[in-house]
């Protein structure tokens, strides 16, 4: 199947498909008569899997390790879940800081007292429920 067909079947751009090939995540065969790439059903399924894992924030390097069998998908998902939980915590702290600052009357750069907000959020962070 041609790359145009792969684009239609996966919803990905030509450049994404080529990037996955360049990164050795897929290796389509070549048509001997013209040298064009010939993508298989298996290539399309792998592209879909790779794209899905990317939406979960899993790196190309980690996906390569999964495909090569160096790590399992389960191990990678567990590690990614920890990373996402940490990012959620950091984002919640940033959100709390923004809300605290927005609650102030006429906040400005000149009046910004960083220690006041960081201390308040650090204390609040310790009392946040974890999920």
Task: List PLM regions with ranges.
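Short, charged amphipathic alpha-helical surface segments
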Residues: 31, 51-52, 56, 61-114
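A very general structural signal that marks isolated residues within well-ordered alpha-helical segments
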Residues: 45, 90, 130-131
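Basic helix-turn-helix/winged-helix DNA-binding cores
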Residues: 1-61
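Conserved small/polar residues in nucleotide/adenosyl-binding loops
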Residues: 124-130
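Glycine-rich, often proline-containing surface loops adjacent to acidic residues and nearby aromatics
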Residues: 112-123
